[in-house]
């Protein structure tokens, strides 16, 4: 699964905070992902950021990721969901 963040113009970014959705619902269960990666768009290609801190998937808090600064128009989270569960993002902050 993936979700994208588009800027109106090229922007330098160096970190993100992701608050993962995790709760039980009558329609299905939502869990933090098993894993995730962050990509940025360079030209027509997606490249993984050079992470400077661990990728975390903790529930009930922001999961902070520092990375080598990049200038881009788009970011993309690619998440590997836990088997049998849905996933989601409550909030995604970009700095």
Give short role names for the model-derived ranges.
Residues 1-50, 56-95:
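Aromatic, loop-rich ligand-recognition surfaces of beta-strand-rich domains
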């Amino acid at each position: 699964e993936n979700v994208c963040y588009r800027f109106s113009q090229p922007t330098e970014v160096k970190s993100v905070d992701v608050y993962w959705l995790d709760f039980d619902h009558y329609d299905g269960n939502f869990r933090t992902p098993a894993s995730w990666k962050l990509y940025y768009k360079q030209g027509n290609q997606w490249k993984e950021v050079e992470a400077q801190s661990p990728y975390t998937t903790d529930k009930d808090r922001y999961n902070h990721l520092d990375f080598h600064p990049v200038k881009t128009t788009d970011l993309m989270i690619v998440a590997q969901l836990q088997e049998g569960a849905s996933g989601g993002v409550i909030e995604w902050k970009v700095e």
